């Protein structure tokens, strides 16, 4: 079973999480931010990952450190759960329509960090959540898997819908990338023989 328990503690955040890549989409999430909770629950549900996550952060400042550090911790958890990435599909992509919004998420578990965030929201906040914290979250994930992540928005007016499409789409794309390739279970999916 590809399951990891992880703690990450700094002066800004204290994070505990359990991630199971081969789960059923069950989640218990408490980040101190209602909107971020909602996004992570959608990510877990649509990726079919089991995720238990608590974060106590300096939310009296804002949600920047909370979002960034959860992204870092989640990326580290994926890296540990995947190990040397033997037998995985490696790539995944998904177009996610959410009402009027349409976003593509594409993933390469390449061992190299790239985030292309081509997402353009028309408001700076959803509730009290700063929209720019969404890209900080995904940059934390990308740096710590490490992985290449592309988010490309094709349509959308409502900021909530656009970000929801990003998180749901990422769940689907990552689920495809971490899926085991039964025909090549013992192989690392790279001509180099390793993913770095």
Descriptions of predicted regions:
Residues 1-196:
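N-terminal intrinsically disordered, cationic/polar leader segments
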């Amino acid at each position: 079973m590809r399951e990891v328990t992880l703690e990450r503690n700094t002066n800004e955040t204290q994070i505990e999480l359990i991630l199971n890549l081969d789960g059923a989409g069950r989640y218990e999430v408490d980040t101190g931010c209602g909107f971020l909770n909602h996004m992570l629950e959608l990510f877990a549900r649509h990726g079919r990952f089991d995720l238990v996550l608590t974060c106590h952060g300096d939310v009296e400042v804002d949600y920047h450190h909370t979002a960034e550090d959860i992204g870092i911790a989640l990326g580290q958890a994926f890296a540990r759960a995947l190990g040397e990435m033997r037998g995985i599909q490696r790539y995944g992509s998904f177009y996610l329509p959410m009402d009027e919004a349409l976003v593509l998420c594409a993933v390469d578990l390449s061992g190299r960090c790239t985030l292309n965030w081509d997402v353009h929201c028309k408001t700076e906040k959803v509730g009290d959540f700063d929209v720019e914290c969404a890209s900080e979250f995904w940059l934390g994930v990308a740096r710590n898997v490490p992985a290449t992540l592309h988010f490309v928005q094709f349509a959308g007016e409502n900021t909530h819908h656009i970000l929801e499409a990003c998180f749901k789409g990422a769940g689907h794309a990552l689920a495809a990338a971490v899926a085991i390739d039964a025909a090549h279970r013992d192989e690392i999916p790279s001509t180099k023989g390793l993913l770095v």
